[in-house]
Amino acid sequence: MLYLFYKKYFFRPLRRPTYKGIAMKTIYILLTRSGTLLSKLVYAVTGASYTHASMAFDEELNCLYSSTRKNGYTMFPAGPSKEYLNKGVFRLRGDAPCALYALDVTDEAYVRARRRAEHMMARGELYRFNTLGLILCALHIRWQRRRHYFCSQFVSEVLEKSGAMELPKDSTLMHPNDYAQLPQLKCLYEGCLADLPQRKAMELGEAPTVVSVYLGLMLGLAKAGVRKIF
């Protein structure tokens, strides 16, 4: 009931955009800095506000696509995989800074982009995380390796190969922060992940699980212990 109330009065769907009478669809790009070990390393090297990029094809962000940790928690195995706002690192790191952007594309480009992303998810065993490419990207050195992608390279490849947009530089050199500078993208939200409207809507709509209750209790006890020490 709370979920339906929130969605009706606070989560307003965007009007479908048009350009010169042509119906357009929207691809969403979510930038985050989760504070994981890899995120901290990238942040230490680049100083970028955001260290991870994901993409979605629905405004509720029910499913995000990227090249990242496959099980949602541990760093490896990694490669093209789906992410969820209420699972894995996104669930544990509600205080992570994030920004949500919208890119309006033609119906044809939208279909091609979604099809390409889904294909890579379905054939996930063929793809790997581009660890060396990520390191070289931070040093502004191009490194293309077949079927290997880091997060922003994955998003860039899907957008470029589908004809959704033209990139200002090679996909292997695209940083998550670069998307925040693109004039084609419209910023819909900037703040902490826990306050993202789509994340809030999910939390209102889900029933608490034994694991979530247990994690909540453990976090509460840990915070109480820290207060006693200091």
Give, region by region, the residue ranges found by the protein language model.
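N-terminal polybasic/positive-inside topogenic patches
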Residues: 13-18
